[in-house]
């Protein structure tokens, strides 16, 4: 059975996150909640010493005075403010900046070596669409793992084993894609199998997928 994970919660004003959801963890959880709403939502993230991020989910865009090249990996605080949005009155000046690179950056740094709290243990995940990551650096291991998730369901540990990369890196990547809201999950998909034992995927062996991804990212 294939599902899109979902959790609907109400809106809330600017608040301090509980300790377990401090920093980007609280922001990532708020992003996920907004993505599950049946009506448009906007989100404002007050990042300590780094101004305010304004996100309009209906427009799939955000505003922020900070370049993603200077993304703060561990800000002292991130205060969260959610508000109802409107399709007729965007909360930011459009076209804004593409949302995928921001959510990718938040997801990579939100939960450390733990999975995002809405990911279900034992379930496998696969891409619903390719990410759009033209504003952020993506290394070859990440490209490999994204390509794998574009073609099969896998857990983070299975992904790490197949890509021969540290499990922490695979968990962070799955978290980033989960915060972007582009994963679907399956309780019954078969275990992911690598192309061969003890073989690290090579660029030449996955050229088609890499080219498609890099073309999608504008690289």
Q: Each predicted region: which residue ranges?
A:
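Acidic, Ser/Thr/Pro-enriched low-complexity segments and adjacent helix/loop capping patches
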Residues: 1-219
